[in-house]
Amino acid sequence: MTKKQKKVLIRIIVSAVLIVALKVVGSFVEINRYLEFALYMIPYFVIGYDILRKAFLGIKNKQVFDENFLMAVATVGAIALGDYTEGVAVMLFYQIGELFQSYAVGKSRRNISELMDIRPDYANIEVDGELRQVDPDEVEIGTVIVVTPGEKVPIDGVVTEGESSLNTSALTGESVPREVKAGDEIISGCINLSGVIRIKTTKEFGESTVSKILDLVENATSKKSHSENFISKFAHYYTPAVCYSALALAIIPPIINLIIGNPAGFGTWIYRALTFLVISCPCAVVISVPLSFFAGIGGASKAGVLVKGSNYLETLSKTKYVLFDKTGTMTKGVFEVVGVHDNTIDKNHLIELAAYAESYSTHPISKSLQTAYGKGIDKSRISDVKEISGHGVIAKVDGKEVAAGNGKLMDMLGLKYTECEQVGTKVHIALDGEYAGHILISDVIKPTSKQAIAELKSAGVKKTVMLTGDASDVAKQVADELGIDEVYSELLPDDKVSKVEEYLSKKSEKEKLAFVGDGINDAPVLSRADIGIAMGAMGSDAAIEAADIVLMDDDPLKIAKAIKISKKCLGIVYENIIFALGVKLVCLILGALGIANMWVAIFADVGVMVIAVLNAIRALMVKKL
């Protein structure tokens, strides 16, 4: 509890003890009416002086209609009618509800702060063989910092020395450690688990991943959802309306009674009007709706899903169309050897020859061959390298001529080669003028991609579409394997934007379209869709800037998880609105009819608020979605 909350708690306890004492004494001793009034004023002012002060300032500043005004009028009115206990009790229970709400909101904020506890307090710099702690803001680009086991990585950079495991769970929601060694890029916010590592910084602290993420989460509350805006407007008109309704309830029925010759019953109708005022307090809705979105954004952050505002969370919950980029989203975006079909020599030797022949090339295919070979390249074994544009390469390896390339290269050399029906890039190999076999290289599908498509369907997505610049046979194979509904291949970036616009025109107004890409090459499409989702954005400034929602790792399952989180959050928002307004409507009618007394009014106000706040906090719990 904060100091302010502790003070309120002490006031609540003192006031409650005084009320109980007065009731007990009053049951045994006859107390003079004026003395009783004076005695009850003590707990009343102890518990309610701040509410009365706020109500007075509201009237003074011409901002009359708020919950403080409602409580002040209701309690002063009850006391004026001689209902001292009820007047003080209404103020007491209102303050109990306010304390609970303050504590719950504070707790949810602390939970989110703990979930996103990635802000580093210091950076270690080595000076004369000793580590010195400095403020991360003071560290310049190119400085070598030291991170020891258990410490947070304070600034983005490249590992220059050491090996370690990193806990990235605060960023990605994943508990599996990430291994790093010299030469690997590393981002701020991770926790070093094992070895000491030295990192050469590549950014200033203010531009580091950790700073961008924290700014994003902290600023998310400024972008209001339609539901929040509706509640704000609703409260703006609702509170004056119920005040005037209560005034009418206090005046009109007694006047009608007088006209028809019955006793006016002013006391009865004023009491009903005061009960009406207490019931009508809109706290439950006004507090619980923003709190639900706040908790939902915090829970999503814990799962490695960064949402830039509650408006995006609300839009995401209505997503019916999901369009994907293929490379880096559904596939790893890295070429790998997926098949070796030897003809005259064994597979390992075939890969070795291809890796050596292609070793001077910087093409991704060359890198995949060297990765498959898995050993260092001895450049002294290679000579007479000749690259033939659009065909491949011819080189001498250990004095023997090796040709590695596509079918055009084999045709140029007059060699017959084996056609391969499998989809992928084929690298044909010839050794001393004789066809030796071919290697199949492909962009590998991520292990969770197929499950991700199934999860999207279960989350209510109507259609999945893949957009790619790849050849049609490659694109079709990936789409068929994953169960994607539609696929468009050989697209330029502008073509992708056109396709997104085409689907935007097809869908209904209530249905929303999300585009998922890597956030770097897909910025125009991300900004054109109803919701732009950037995947695998750890360390990618472009992704964080371009998208509405940022997935911190490259697991496609997170797309469905983000949608499920948004649906749960919106469900809680609607539950609170319907529950709070429903209970209040029933109690308002009962209060106007004289069936509900002030104690029922206290439940309709404080009780409903407590239940709604507790329900809102459920939005933090997203682990099992």
Q: What would you call each of these model-derived segments?
A:
Residues 245, 506-510, 547, 552-625:
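Membrane-embedded transport module
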Residues 1-14, 238:
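N-terminal membrane topogenic signal
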Residues 67-72, 171, 271, 281-357, ...:
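Conserved catalytic phosphorylation-site environment of P-type ATPases
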Residues 16-17, 229-260, 272-293, 574-603:
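Bilayer-spanning, highly hydrophobic alpha-helical transmembrane segments
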Residues 56-66, 103-113, 291-310, 619-625:
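Juxtamembrane helix-loop transition segments at the membrane interface in multi-pass membrane proteins
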Residues 399, 425, 431-575:
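Conserved ATP-binding TGD loop and adjacent catalytic N/P-domain core of P-type ATPases
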Residues 337-463, 472, 484-500:
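P-type ATPase nucleotide-binding
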Residues 23, 40-126, 138-145, 152, ...:
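Actuator/coupling domain of P-type ATPases
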